[in-house]
Amino acid sequence: MSKLVPPETKDLSPAQMEQVFSKVSQFFSLLSEPSRLKILFILCDGEQSVNTVMERAGSSQANVSRHLTALHRAGILARRKEGVTVYYAIEDEASLEICQSVCARVVEKIKS
């Protein structure tokens, strides 16, 4: 069994494995946008309104909303509305852990 994929995949057909690889590729593609990583960094402090994310990211509302929507649709962020204010929070802790791990590795490389 390959170290790349977990043991749970041992019973999958080649076609199903292709689906797994495609979904993993989509996940990393979603996170390959620096603005989305910045938004995740901001949301590590807890739930934030769109306006707060916009201010802290230093980006336009249209740009921030586009990225928040993409992350929400992917199941990485939770969204709730209170009156006219929309709040986002990290929902998928596993996705956050992947980002933290990669960021830690990059910081190691930068410091060495």
What is each of the regions a protein language model found here?
Residues M1-P7:
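N-terminal acidic, proline/glycine-rich, low-complexity intrinsically disordered segments
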Residues P14, E18-F21, Q61, L96-C99:
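Short, structured helix-loop boundary elements
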Residues K23-V24, A89-S112:
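Conserved segment of winged-helix/HTH DNA-binding domains
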Residues H67:
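Residues within the DNA-recognition helix of helix-turn-helix
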Residues S22-N63, V86-A94:
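N-terminal helix-turn-helix DNA-binding core of bacterial DNA-binding proteins
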Residues H72-E82, A89:
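Beta-hairpin "wing" of winged helix-turn-helix
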